[in-house]
Amino acid sequence: WGYQEYVDIYKAAWRLNRSLPPDAPKFRILNLSYIFRWDNFTPGPRNPENVAAVFTRGTVDKFRAEIIEQEVLQKGEKALALVGTTHAFTKYGSPYFKYNGDNFCDYDHDWLGGRLFRKYPGRVFNIMLHQAFNKREGDSYIQISPLEGLLEKIMALNGNKPVGFDLLDSPMGRQPDPSIYSMCYKDFTLGQLFDGYIFLKPLSQLEGCTPIKGFVNEQNIEEALRQFPDPDWHAPVKNLEDMVRFIDENPRSMIRGYNSL
């Protein structure tokens, strides 16, 4: 949350609601998560016990799906959910190695999008924002431009103007995708992943979020350290200096990768 663009969304909603007539429906922002307890996390391999100690209200995407169902779908309303790419999967199941699985594969269909799509197939659609994909190369993974650069070549013919387009039953959606998403799938195409796509700029021109100076400070650093997420996924963050460095570097490192594509 230490980035200006997140705060700007709240400010925009506030300004809009102040401009509406008193009896007009207000623009709502729904928080799709609860407060996790990372201070309860036990280092070591993840298992049901140490994960449950962190996610005390249950599986996160189940929690999120229930909020959207109760607050939006059951009321016959619509919402735009901004979530991480994998959480938005609907029809697509993210593959993983399974020793006893057919072709040694199995598929996770329990992301937020998949949970909602199963119950409301005609009302749930997913749209991907232009981003880098990952591809396996030997024993490591590298970032690639979508469709190995074909998508950006086509966008360049349109002057790189921002545009949204269908992937479902469309020529672009029928293009083969060799990224990590194609693992365990035969003849995988981009349209199997998402229903639509929004192109903003070439990857080399995208910018990262803007860190808010002083968002984490001497007054709140102890609580921030106790609740800092996924401590087993990154270098230790032990003090305010480490925290500020992490917040600043996080978007920069992603954009450095994008700018090299």
Placement of each model-derived feature along the sequence:
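Compositional signal for N-terminal targeting/processing segments
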Residues: 1-261
